[in-house]
Swiss-Prot record:
Provenance organism: Latilactobacillus sakei subsp. sakei (strain 23K) (Lactobacillus sakei subsp. sakei)
Compartments reported by the entry: Cytoplasm
Entry's EC annotation: 5.6.1.7
Species lineage: Bacteria, Bacillati, Bacillota, Bacilli, Lactobacillales
Region listing for Disordered, in residue ranges: 521-541
Enzyme class: isomerase
Protein name per the record: Chaperonin GroEL
GO biological process: protein refolding
């Protein structure tokens, strides 16, 4: 296919137009008075959301060059979401501000390489200062406040704080759709390990790219499955029962994997294969843990067991299994409570006896997975559209809370970014490097400016007033008061704020140093030739 090229100012202006279209759509959702965005769906009713990354992913522009600019900023939102789980709108706002100011200066003749260096220096200083003013999460109230700010709902904040209290800060918390209209919390016995599906064609939910199995059989083995004939008798028995299957094995490759995928795609039966967690002797122990939880027998040569001879009664079962590209979560395993209790006691004895800190840490992880369980937040709403929107909010709040536990929290509402301006302004460089620093200084004001704009106020006036306030005092757009944001419970996780700034600066710096853009040239499809009019034949037979 032929390519179309644009250079220098032409290329950058087109990409900036794409950046603006995406960012202007996303930034309307920022803050407690942010608006919603309605997304058209190919099937079913439109989706209403205020989730930055969901909106960014949905935007495709007709112009190839503009679309590339939009996609680069969408990448900022996605990366921030992957690292911190929240802060995608803030990241988009920061990226747009840095790119726009940078483009102005590059167009005026500044050296983009010098500007990039200045952006990197300023970002590093801002991140350092964010860590200095960060507070550790030391109470259930702080957890509830972080979650409440992210979800814009105090009840959600309390729910997430309760969930973390029950399963621990590192425990497994999942968000599911409820059949009723109330949102509630329940804790079920379950386990999560860090192995995802071996093929993306095994997913059942294409939007979230995860596989959900209800009441599946679970085959656990330390063997490699390469030949489908090894498990064919077992698969035939499972197909007859019409149940799903989770395979946990050393590996599934050769002809076995494509055969399983083909049967999944054809709808013969629902199957997901994952690699066994851990390595060496630790892997054997973890497989035994999973087997105890699910009531399975580990198919291993150590016990003289072969895959060809495996029967259904050697398989485990569970109420639900969810597999993502990175993790597998088993909920409501059918193992006997006495066997699980015995296994837990055995691990506790090993913890007491071990002299290695590393071994103790790994044993405690296993204990938490066996004994801690999984907290499930069941989201309820009156309509399906509201349900999806609520679920997005709770998932964001949960991610934000985990981020706060990890790196602490800072004053919310964009106040922390203004609080670091003084430190960044103290940097003194020359020429275009200083220009890059000044660009970041201006961008740090942008989240507060946008929150104020969304609340119907003049953003620049609010920014100047926040600058004149003591550290951590800012504008609460929810009630219109000026107050200490920490004391008012308006908190942002440090990790979220840091990731948003770092990712925005990274992509912005790359765009500013772009000198050429290559895109596919649109094909000119000529109109098909019109059919000949029979009457033009003059009645010829």
């Amino acid at each position: 296919m032929a390519k179309e090229l644009k250079f220098s100012e032409d290329a950058r202006s087109k990409m900036l137009a794409g950046v603006d279209q995406l960012a202007n759509t996303v930034k309307t959702t920022l803050g407690p008075k942010g608006r919603n965005v309605v997304l058209e769906k190919a099937y079913g009713s439109p989706e209403i959301t205020n989730d930055g990354v969901t909106i960014a992913k949905a935007i495709e522009l007709e112009d190839h060059f503009e679309n590339m600019g939009a996609k680069l900023v969408s990448e900022v939102a996605s990366k921030t979401n992957d690292i911190a789980g929240d802060g995608t709108t803030t990241a988009t706002v920061l990226a747009q501000a840095i790119i726009r100011e940078g483009m102005k200066n590059v167009t005026a003749g500044a050296n983009p390489v010098g500007i990039r260096r200045g952006i990197e220096l300023a970002t590093r200083e801002a991140v350092k200062k964010l860590h200095e003013i960060s507070h550790k999460v030391e109470s259930k109230d702080a957890i509830a406040q972080v979650a409440a700010v992210s979800s814009a709902n105090e009840e959600t904040g309390r729910l997430i704080a309760d969930a973390m209290e029950k399963v621990g800060n590192d425990g497994v918390i999942t968000v599911e759709e409820s059949k009723g209209i109330d949102t509630e919390l329940s804790v079920v016995e379950g386990m999560q390990f860090d192995r995802g599906y071996l093929s993306q064609y095994m997913v059942t939910d294409n939007d979230k790219m995860e596989a959900d199995l209800d009441n599946p059989y679970i085959l656990i083995t330390d063997k490699k499955i390469s030949n489908i004939q090894d498990v064919l008798p077992l698969l035939q028995s499972i197909v007859q029962e019409g149940k799903a299957l989770l395979i946990i094995a050393d590996d599934v490759d050769g002809e076995a994997l494509p055969t399983l995928v083909l049967n999944k795609i054809r709808g013969t039966f629902n199957v997901v294969a994952v690699k066994a967690p851990g390595f060496g002797d630790r892997r054997k122990e973890q497989l035994e843990d999973i087997a105890t939880l699910t009531g399975a027998t580990v198919i291993t040569s150590d016990l003289g067991l072969e895959l060809k001879e495996t029967t259904i009664d050697q398989l485990g079962t569970a109420g639900k299994v969810t597999v993502t590209k990175d993790d597998t979560t088993i909920v409501e395993g059918a193992g006997s409570k006495s066997a699980i209790a015995e296994r837990v006691e055995n691990i506790k004895k090993q913890i007491a006896e071990t002299t290695s800190d590393f071994d103790r840490e790994k044993l405690q992880e296993r204990l938490a997975k066996l004994a801690g369980g999984v907290a499930v937040i069941k989201v309820g709403a009156a309509t399906e559209t509201e349900l999806k929107e609520q679920k997005y909010r709770i998932e964001d709040a949960l991610n934000a809370t985990r981020a706060a536990v990890e790196e602490g929290y800072v004053a919310g509402g964009g106040t922390a970014l203004i609080d670091v301006i003084e430190s960044v302004a103290a940097l003194e460089e020359e020429g275009d490097v200083q220009t890059g620093i000044n660009i970041v200084l201006r961008a740090l004001e942008e989240p507060v400016r946008q929150i104020a704009t969304n609340a119907g106020l003049e953003g620049s006036v609010i920014v100047e007033k926040v600058k004149s306030q003591p550290v951590e005092v800012g504008y609460n757009a929810a009630n219109g008061n000026w107050e200490n944001m920490i004391e008012a419970g308006i908190l942002d996780p440090t990790k979220v704020t840091r990731s948003a700034l770092q990712n925005a600066a990274s992509v912005a710096a790359l765009m500013l140093t772009t000198e050429a853009v290559v895109a596919d040239k649109p094909e000119d499809n000529p109109a098909p030739a019109a059919g000949m009019d029979p009457s033009a034949m003059g009645g010829m037979m």
